[in-house]
Regions:
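Short, acidic/polar
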Residues: 2-11, 130-137
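Cys-nucleophile CN-hydrolase/nitrilase-fold catalytic domain and related Cys-dependent amidase chemistry
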Residues: 4-87, 154-174, 178-179
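Active-site catalytic loop in hydrolytic enzyme cores
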Residues: 73-151, 155-170, 227, 234-242
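C-terminal/domain-edge helix-coil "capping" segments
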Residues: 236-256
């Protein structure tokens, strides 16, 4: 699998530069099932041990990888999933909560976990999930100081637009500032016979400062340090000091 070779190259670079976590794009293994002729052909059965076999070449003593793929469950359901691969084993999975704006072959995930590697506690929100404020806030409330955003904005040429990169960056800044967390987005970039992605990869710090931004339409490699200790108090989390605001917000959420 060519993607595994590419990821291995990036892991080797991470090892040489002292980088501890590598975030890969959404669906980097096999692409997105929504564009596959036979989605089951690119799906990986985690419970049968197939994922461990596929990821074995990525084993590293110092680098943890976040790898996107299509998961198939024993009952045949498909999930858009990211695996955390740490020291030769899968230590966690995140299933995309909002598979698509309109229609998708993927089932929605129903868990909002956080993960720990070394001193870093982090969450994962896949692509469209980042547009919703709730998953990020729930993860931050569980102690996450960073959010990784595997993304795949590869679209048919007539739909591809560089404006999508601007929208993604604005979303990253919003999630970072709202939750006082670092946001690390990893997108695909370039052209294939049928798809185009301008590439929205970037790193934003907890104050909303853009630390790194990828070149458009080309492969890139972004690096930044992230904070591992939650800032207290987190910005804007003390709305309860005004009971009227809290009551109105509770009513709004309840009525949605």
């Amino acid at each position: 699998m060519a993607a595994i070779d590419l990821i291995r190259e990036q892991i080797d670079r991470c090892e040489s530069e002292g980088i501890e976590i590598l975030c890969c794009p959404e669906g980097i293994l096999g692409g997105l099932a929504d564009y596959a002729i036979r989605p089951q052909d690119i799906a990986i059965d985690v419970e049968a041990g197939k994922l461990d076999e596929v990821l074995a070449p990525l084993a590293s003593d110092t680098v943890t990888s976040i790898v996107g793929f299509t998961e198939i469950t024993p009952n045949g359901r498909l999930h858009n999933t990211a695996a955390i691969y740490h020291r030769g084993g899968v230590i966690g999975l995140y299933r995309k909560l909002y598979p698509a704006i309109r229609k998708s072959v993927y089932e929605a995930g129903d868990e909002i976990p956080v993960f720990e590697v070394g001193a870093l506690k982090f969450g994962i929100v896949i692509c469209l999930d980042s547009n919703y404020l709730e998953p990020a806030r729930i993860m931050a409330a569980q102690g996450a100081t960073a959010l990784f955003v595997p993304t795949n904005n590869g679209l048919p040429a007539e739909k591809a637009d560089c404006a999508l990169c601007v929208q993604a960056r604005n979303v990253d800044i919003a999630r970072a500032v709202e939750n006082t967390v670092s946001v690390i987005r990893a997108d695909v970039a370039g052209r294939t016979e049928s798809l185009v992605s301008y590439g929205s990869s970037g790193i934003v710090d907890p104050d909303g400062m853009v630390l790194a931004s990828a070149r458009k339409l080309s492969e890139d490699f972004l690096v930044a340090d992230t904070e591992t200790t939650p800032r207290e108090p987190r910005r804007g989390w003390n709305a309860s000091t005004n009971s009227s605001v809290m009551k109105e917000y509770a009513r709004l959420v309840r009525d949605v």
